[in-house]
Amino acid sequence: MIDTSDVEYFPTAIVGAGCAGLTLAHELINSKDFPCILLDPQKFRPEHAFSFWDDGHPHLTLARSLARKTWSKWEIRTFEETIQKSSSRFVYSTVSSSNYENYLFKKITENRGKILNARATDLYNTETCIRLETSSRNAVFANRVFDSRPPTPTNKTIFQHFLGWEITTNKSVFDETLVTLMDFRVPQEDGFHFMYVLPYSETCALIESTVYSDTVFKPKWYENQITKYLMNVIQCKSWDVINKEQGAIPLNYKKDLKPLGAPIGLNAGAMRTSTGYAFSQIIHQAI
């Protein structure tokens, strides 16, 4: 990322350079509200799979072009039954978070947008613009400010929490044409628990242990669940873990006392709390 050492004025400032902040900045490139500056103390972000339902809408054109894999068939499984569906209109797609965000970052900086590796600490309205104080001691001046920081969970929130392994196998064990959205053939004692399977090929897939509960577990818990699922349900005896991802999404949260600009992203209701999906809604907000 790029640091700015001098105080500068920007038509737009965005607090946070994650998915929501970068998506909005990219959408502003050809508008009068660009160039913009994004403020974020985090230099690197862990890899995640951004998955979404693609109905062919134009606002998903970029995401569609960057999709790692798409599926037109999906299923939900329990011990008692399997429900499979397919559609030519709705396609399930997944995008690598690093590929998506790196693409946006490149386009933003090529067009004179900037990233400041600093935390926004306060906001003041002046007679002519907005002044953002930062942890780098450099103030940022902008005409408009957007705040993409995630919301603060309440004390009694429910989380959708998960840990996933991307694995490779030496034998064909996955149907690469079929996404398993929820497989409930796993223990249910610790919460609403299912496995989520994105098969990238017959020998490569993301296997994610996902739970809805008020307690986030230690990594070993999910890893044990994935191991048992692979061995007992998938009937896979050996594999290599080539990537991991982990997260905890609060499904209810409180209003922050002082937003640093107009909220976007999760703080602006981009996530569907019943499912945890947010990617396509974040893009729709930006447009």
Regions found by a protein language model. Name each.
Residues 1-12, 31:
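Extreme N-terminal leader/targeting segments of oxidoreductases
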Residues 55-118, 123-125:
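A conserved beta-strand/loop capping segment in the N-terminal third of enzymes
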Residues 17, 27, 110-239, 252-257:
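Predominantly flavin-linked oxidoreductase catalytic cores and closely associated redox partners
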Residues 3-4, 38-68:
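Conserved N-terminal glycine-rich FAD pyrophosphate-binding loop of Rossmann-like flavoproteins
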Residues 187-192, 246-264, 269-273:
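FAD-binding beta-loop-beta segment adjacent to the flavin cofactor pocket
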